[in-house]
Structures are given as C-alpha cells and as structure tokens.
C-alpha cells in the first residue's frame, strides 16, 4: 500500500516475513494494553514507536503530533465524567 508523503510522490511499504523469537508475556501485555489484534501488530507498533523516538531525537520536536503512533494514546483511561 502506498501513502502520500507530501512530496509529490508516494512512499511504498514492503512487507517481509521474518521469523523472530520474542517474549510471549511481553507480546500479550502489549496486545492487552494497546488493544492490538495480535503479535504482528504488537511488533509493528513497537518498531514504529522506536523509529518515532529516534526521529524525534534526531530532528527535534518540529514534527506534527500523530496520536496513532503515540503508544500512550492507546492506553485505556477511565472517564472522569460525573454527570
């Protein structure tokens, strides 16, 4: 799938099957906490989060906030609505 990069062209992501060993307890915690569908989405979220943090460290905080790649935005919060 392609996405508009804002540069007049498209960026294409390529999926690649990779066999990795991961801590299943950690995967299950990520699945529950961020409500992702499975291990694949948990790993993708982790990788994108790491890249996002690396980009922020390199380029400062000039980038637009993207709530979908912010893991804290996925944490369920209790409503404080009293009325």
UniProtKB/Swiss-Prot annotation:
InterPro entries: VapB_antitoxin
Organism domain of life: Bacteria
Spans annotated as Disordered: 58-83
UniProt protein name: Uncharacterized protein Rv0634A
Organism: Mycobacterium tuberculosis (strain ATCC 25618 / H37Rv)
Species lineage: Bacteria, Bacillati, Actinomycetota, Actinomycetes, Mycobacteriales
């Amino acid at each position: 799938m392609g996405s508009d990069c804002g540069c007049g062209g498209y960026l294409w992501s390529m999926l690649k099957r990779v066999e990795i060993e991961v801590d299943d307890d950690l995967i299950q915690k990520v699945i529950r906490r961020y409500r992702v569908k499975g291990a694949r989405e948990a790993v993708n979220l982790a990788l994108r989060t790491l890249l996002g943090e690396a980009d922020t460290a390199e380029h400062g905080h000039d980038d637009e906030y993207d709530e979908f790649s912010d893991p804290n935005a996925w944490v369920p919060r209790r409503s404080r609505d009293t009325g």
